[in-house]
């Protein structure tokens, strides 16, 4: 069987990394800027933080503040945001280490994700799985994150990775991770930050500018990067028996990929799993989770320009899992100390340094 995982920021959040855009904004706004365009943007951002939950989508709207005559100013702003975000994420990434015990759990979650389903869902998936089982399981992972946390956990080094055997009944099946791709690059290479298509660039002049398109439209940026990672990811989705979406908001700026996933489910017997975090569900009324699951199915198909029968087929073949502990591992600091403990223990040294600096001034 062929499995494809699409991994989003929820993966890093589950590791307790502060990788939400809001976390980054606090840092970004505090950084000094000499450039007037960047300073003005930070003022706008600071006054409208609640409206900037989706940085990429809002950048497409913010393009309205520019024209062809000052397109270079817009490019400078985009590059400044990208560079600052990369630096911030590198700091978060550097804090992360993982134990062997957590690695084992993460590998087990990858090859036995169905354990997080309800008993009824597990039974339904088991019926689907039996006729599709082969001598081994092939896992391909597409991450939308820029960080290196996934590589640290799984030890990925660019070659097929043996994840061990998976027992089903009296049989044992080998499991291999054959592909791992940063579809939007990393903080150090081909980092892609942008919108799904030209319709999300609200300024018509910039929308038609090849310079802006190459800097802001994800599909064009990937094509121009020339790595062919987008082709490899599309091929993986087109051949998948099972597709799992984990930790992704199902937002508009990744609509290109929702279309590829939806097409595979609509045109085949493949199954889609969406793992999502929602508000706390009262244990007394856990049966009401079905409403939330239906909402998530509807959200997914709302991005697809498909006919109604195709959308209904996709919803029937989609499992939704809420608030699972999948990929939940600990964030380990040196000697298991938290950042707050480290700062507290070094408070005296920091005070001494500040006094010395004061005398120098």
Model feature map: region roles:
Residues 1-15, 231-361:
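SIR2/sirtuin-family catalytic core signature
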Residues 2-6, 15-182, 230-239, 252-266, ...:
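Active-site periphery "cap/insert" segments of enzyme catalytic domains
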Residues 41-43, 191-238, 246, 288-297:
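Acidic, metal/cofactor-coordinating or nucleic-acid-engaging core segments within structured domains
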Residues 175-178, 189-196, 283-285:
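Short, charged, surface-exposed secondary-structure boundary motifs
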Residues 183-188, 198, 248-249:
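Histidine- and/or cysteine-centered catalytic micro-motif in compact active-site loops
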Residues 185-191, 325-330:
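Short, conserved secondary-structure transition motifs
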